[in-house]
Amino acid sequence: MQKNFSDVMPVLARHNGEWTGDYIYFSSQGEILDRHKSHLICRITAGEKYPYYQQNTYTWNDGRAEQFELHATCKQARIWFDTDRIQGSCWEIDSKTLMLNWIRKDIPKSYFYEMIQINEASDARSRVWHWFENDVLVKRVCISETKVIT
């Protein structure tokens, strides 16, 4: 019998919905490098091949915008991404925490680790990326988001 996605990854299932927030990029020395607004759609789907879908939209004050989509498979209590942009996985640590690791296919010799904390009400989350290139920490990204649609 196939388990429900929410049973396999209950913390990730709490992220289902639409989120808005702010990304702030810092150098490894703590200087602000960039910042932008975000709108993320995170969906647990009925799809057997890709039970997880995410669409990220970023907007900057100067009018720039970027949008991309991610689809993920689920195996052994992890979701696995392999898109044109990234390759990696996400797993649960405890009742509030997700961990991710991935590479950016367009940035050679880069890899990322991300920790996501969701609150008890499942309506606010904080995320931190550690961005490495050539095994050296080059950036940290701090993200604060609020759920706007369940």
Each predicted region: which residue ranges?
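Central antiparallel beta-sheet cores of small beta-barrel/beta-sandwich binding domains
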Residues: 33-107, 111-112
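Alpha-helical interaction segments
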Residues: 8-10, 70, 81, 119-121
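Structural motif
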Residues: 18, 97, 122-124
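Amphipathic/hydrophobic helical signal segments and adjacent flexible N-terminal regions
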Residues: 1-69, 133-150
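Glycine-rich, aromatic-bearing surface loops/beta-hairpins
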Residues: 102-104, 108-150
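Generic preference for well-ordered secondary structure
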Residues: 3, 26, 96, 100, ...
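Surface-exposed coil/turn segments at beta-strand junctions on protein surfaces, enriched
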Residues: 12-14, 93, 120
